[in-house]
Design a protein with these regions (language model features):
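Alpha-helical membrane insertion/targeting regions
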Residues: 1-222
């Protein structure tokens, strides 16, 4: 079965869009934490309660979001086939940095699940589950590459990447809840995380299969 280039490129276009959303969210959160008077938007900001929650745990927030942005940016570069082929040595060193960064992101996410509970038990359940899934995927990816099992390594890294993108996916979902204003952040935050993480994790597995199909078709056409 052949796979057209648009079919392969479309999912990755969506991925890049989500990475941009994530980096924009990290930038905004950083500015609000460092200069709240200038960037928070005051009491008229519908996200004022969320901003206050993050401000109470500013150090933990920075430990999570800054490595998180680095993880998504580096992982996106690492998945580029042309980059791996031209800079294999750099790819391997960046991979080590990526694993360390991912461990920080996953561990801090577990801590935040209980210390910064905005959406109640529903949010805690979602973030705890997917933080554990993220760490498992990351560790398995590392173990597979140590055994020189590149295909399995890539498969598990895509899964970890899918979980990481879940945070970006929650942003437009949260924005829609704010727009309708029928639920409070405590009521909808957990729902948003379940939707975001489940969507990107499932999509990540699908992208992995699509990637393998595309690679096999490319080999057959040579």
């Amino acid at each position: 079965m052949s796979v057209s280039k648009p079919t392969v490129r479309l999912p990755w276009s969506a991925v890049i869009f989500l990475v941009v959303i994530a980096i924009a969210a990290v930038t905004r959160r950083t500015l609000v934490l460092l200069w709240p008077a200038r960037f928070s938007g005051g009491t008229s900001n519908p996200a004022a309660a969320l901003d206050a929650g993050f401000a109470r745990h500013a150090a933990l927030t920075f430990v999570h979001i800054l490595p998180g942005a680095l993880f998504l940016g580096l992982a996106t570069l690492q998945f580029a086939r042309s980059f791996r082929q031209k800079h294999l040595r750099l790819h391997r060193w960046l991979g080590r940095i990526l694993v360390i960064t991912g461990l920080v992101v996953g561990t801090s996410a577990l801590v935040m699940s209980f210390k910064m509970n905005i959406g109640g038990p529903n949010e805690t359940a979602a973030t705890t589950l997917f933080a554990i899934v993220f760490l498992i995927c990351l560790i398995r990816a590392y173990l597979f590459i140590r055994r020189k099992q590149v295909a399995r390594h890539r498969e598990w890294m895509i899964r970890a990447y899918g979980v990481g993108l879940g945070v970006a996916t929650t942003r437009p979902i949260v924005g829609m809840f704010f727009a309708f204003r029928r639920l409070t952040p405590h009521e909808f935050f957990g729902i948003a995380f379940w939707l975001g993480f489940t969507t990107t994790f499932s999509s990540g597995r699908g992208m992995g299969r699509l990637r393998e199909t595309s690679r096999c078709c490319a080999h057959r056409s040579e």
